[in-house]
Amino acid sequence: MEWRSLPVELQEEILSRVPAKYLARLRSTSKQWNALSKTGSFAKKHSANATKEPLIIMLKDSRVYLASVNLHGVHNNVAQSFELGSRLYLKDPHISNVFHCDGLLLLCSIKENTLEVWNPCSGEAKLIKPRHSYYKESDFYALGYDNKSSCKKYKVLRVISQVHVQGDFKIEYEIYDFTNDSWRVHGATTELSIRQKHPVSVKGSTYWVVRNRYFPYKYFLSFDFSTERFQSLSLPQPFPYLVTDLSVVREEQLCLFGYYNWSTTSEDLNVWVTTSLGSVVSWSKFLTIQIIKPRVDMFDYGMSFLVDEQNKSLVCWISQKVLHIVGEIYHIQDLDDHGRDSALRSSCSVLMNYVPSLAQIQ
């Protein structure tokens, strides 16, 4: 029996279970399937039924690449290796930051003064014009959605850092709403210091580790795109770490990275995983290992990391180097392109899991 002779409802049910990265190839074989994959009802069914198969995305030298981690032999004391694949985004060669939410990528290019939301799976894209004439390198961005609505309403958060003539420091917030294609000023504060250029997203909300400007400690901050409010959450206590970062596991849990205890100058690297994530957050220790080689100043340009719970491994991307940890064994892999123009170096290091989807940009 041919596919075309099957009832349309059955075709839709079967296609809704095909992983997004393979479905993208099938669309080119049938106009009917291509049209079906672009409907909102199918995208919703596909999100519920299809197996999630994450890919790894890396921002290196202002370019976005697919990447992979070779785990073959790690249980026989053979070091895992990191392999850079093909470029994922070819339109703009000067990407300064990239953010992932629900299968959509938010791409920022300060050199070209562009902010774009793109679905690599469907090819759908949307350029977002700034409220004023330009975006700034000191800006922070996040993409999320209203998870209390029957249909996901995507929004972009822009965090603007300003230093006034008198030396006063202020952070302003703007929100871009896709439904009316416009920015609006959301609020301002003089208390926060957000230095993590690459926040993470879980179920539509965004998370950072931030510092209060008036106290020497860090805390956990979330932004709920449904209520459009920030909320302070708890970190594991005590948390006296100089280098911190967040990552996402299985699209539902957060991993927290802490390195270099400033109160004891200990070089222990610690990773925690959330056991509950909501208005109350609980953490469980995943990994502790003493790292000798990385210097603290290696983290000046930021870092990103991924955790593989099944293989008890961690991959950390820092200043053109990849730190691999499997159990209690670690090594450092150099990905530096010697002789390459340093002007192409990204202002931040981004390494993240990307789960393809048919999410539609609204």
From Swiss-Prot:
- PROSITE patterns linked: FBOX (PS50181)
Domain F-box spans what residues?
Answer: 1-46
Which Pfam families has this protein been placed in? F-box, FBA_1
Segments forming a coiled coil: none
What domain of life?
Answer: Eukaryota
Q: Which CDD domains does the protein's record reference?
A: F-box_AtFBW1-like
InterPro entries attached to this UniProt entry: F-box-assoc_dom_typ1, F-box-assoc_interact_dom, F-box-like_dom_sf, F-box_dom, Gal_Oxase/kelch_b-propeller, SCF_F-box_component
Q: Which Gene3D superfamilies match?
A: 1.20.1280.50
UniProt-listed NCBIfam families: F_box_assoc_1 (TIGR01640)
User: What is the protein named?
Assistant: Putative F-box protein At3g23260
Species, as recorded: Arabidopsis thaliana
